[in-house]
Amino acid sequence: MQATKSPDDLVKTFKSILKEERFGSQSEIVTALQAEGFSNINQSKVSRMLSKFGAVRTRNAKQEMVYCLPAELGVPTAGSPLKNLVLDVDHNQAMIVVRTSPGAAQLIARLLDSIGKPEGILGTIAGDDTIFICPSSIHNIEDTLETVKSLFNYAD
């Protein structure tokens, strides 16, 4: 006979499932938890767990609305150090792209615009979590990239 799973197992599995960022409804989460062996789970309990852990719905990489946890989301707060809001910095021959926590791109872009041309930044365009940086000169894009990375203590 199989031992029943503990509440700690449920919490661990619940968090693991939300990290997958592919569940857009509570019923999908119920089904996934039942598949993991939690037969006594229902929509009401999932709803309470979502509230308890502060889960929110946001868009994943495929632009689907899914549930995720705040720790995975990295929601900016007034006390968030700016370096914690920058998730990735990359570039090609013409542009630098900065990925941020959801909702942080406008704040980071405003900072980048304020340092501007002296640091090699002609301008920025920001969405919710992505910033396109147009360098003053594509010939010095590596220098501008390093400036942006050092500004946020970002290391590859």
UniProtKB/Swiss-Prot annotation:
Family under the similarity heading:
Belongs to the ArgR family.
Q: Quick one: which pathway?
A: Amino-acid biosynthesis; L-arginine biosynthesis [regulation]
Q: Which Gene3D superfamilies match?
A: 3.30.1360.40, Winged helix-like DNA-binding domain superfamily/Winged helix DNA-binding domain
* One GO-annotated biological process of the protein: regulation of arginine biosynthetic process
Keywords assigned: Amino-acid biosynthesis, Arginine biosynthesis, Cytoplasm, DNA-binding, Repressor, Transcription, Transcription regulation
One short Pfam name that applies is: Arg_repressor
Quote the SUPFAM superfamilies the UniProt record gives: C-terminal domain of arginine repressor, Winged helix' DNA-binding domain
Which HAMAP family does this one have?
Arg_repressor
Would you tell me the Gene Ontology cellular component terms? cytoplasm
Q: What is this protein called?
A: Arginine repressor
Q: Which domain of life is it from?
A: Bacteria
What is the purpose of this protein? Regulates arginine biosynthesis genes.
Question: Which compartments does it reside in?
Answer: Cytoplasm
| UniProt xrefs under InterPro entries | Arg_repress, Arg_repress_C, Arg_repress_C_sf, Arg_repress_DNA-bd, WH-like_DNA-bd_sf, WH_DNA-bd_sf
Gene Ontology molecular function: any one: DNA-binding transcription factor activity
Mostly located where? Answer: cytoplasm
